[in-house]
């Protein structure tokens, strides 16, 4: 193996834990782990540790959980570890300039897109939402901007017509550790080749909201089908029927022109619930009424056919 780097790892969710696990499995020297404070979760609102904390404690690594890295005493926690590099994966806290400059080789980040496309909070979802043909991971040198640092390594993968944000998340959670380990080797060997991002190609991946996930029937069927996959498993595309939210898990596009107003139910049968859109027909295949499990359109029609009378409009 190349020169053994002293690594600080900073991350919080399962996506980050897969990267830390890969580093440890490949023999890297992780000298400390930073993760967000325990948060209330579940019905009992019991304080729960992050997946990163669970893994780090399992492996006997020192864990630090500052609320912020702005206070001097918290920055000193980083300095005292005398790291060569800090690896940041979905940490959730801003790293001040002073922290970015502490490790000898700086701080590097694993980002879930092919930068400079989809800088920001929701790159996986936005790549699906926009109909991109491929996505991937970028390992970049961090600076004070939002995903603006020089790119060190990229790995790409195709986006299929069946991918959801959930399946794409899993694909990138496999690619990310591969790219990270390669990048660390290059940093240790002095062979890394930073590449400046082309500002003319930048797009921003804004955070998702539950309101954005409400189905807008004026959009095209193709756009709506992509939204349904992009917002799965969160926040989930939804429509409202009789004041109740109904989540949509799966749909398909029927490329047939219709003069019906967007939102008009055209057919409701065992093939699905066909609804007119701004362009084309969206066929709803799997839905989930409030308080119920997801079910096929046919199963929902068996219990709630009055919701989907042809000619009625969904709003």
Curated annotation (Swiss-Prot):
Molecular function GO terms recorded: methionyl-tRNA formyltransferase activity
Sequence intervals crossing the membrane: none
Keyword field: Protein biosynthesis, Transferase
Highest taxon in the source lineage: Bacteria
EC number: 2.1.2.9
Positions that bind (6S)-5,6,7,8-tetrahydrofolate: 113-116
Reactions accelerated catalytically: L-methionyl-tRNA(fMet) + (6R)-10-formyltetrahydrofolate = N-formyl-L-methionyl-tRNA(fMet) + (6S)-5,6,7,8-tetrahydrofolate + H(+)
The keyword Protein biosynthesis belongs to this UniProt entry's keyword annotation: yes
Alphabetical list of InterPro entries matching this protein: Fmt, Formyl_trans_C, Formyl_trans_C_sf, Formyl_transf_N, Formyl_transf_N_sf, Formyl_transferase-like_C_sf, GART_AS, Met-tRNA-FMT_C
Family of this protein: Belongs to the Fmt family.
NCBIfam families, alphabetized: fmt
Function, in words: Attaches a formyl group to the free amino group of methionyl-tRNA(fMet). The formyl group appears to play a dual role in the initiator identity of N-formylmethionyl-tRNA by promoting its recognition by IF2 and preventing the misappropriation of this tRNA by the elongation apparatus.
Protein name: Methionyl-tRNA formyltransferase
Annotated organism of origin: Escherichia coli O139:H28 (strain E24377A / ETEC)
Phylogenetic classification of the source organism: Bacteria, Pseudomonadati, Pseudomonadota, Gammaproteobacteria, Enterobacterales
Gene behind this protein: fmt
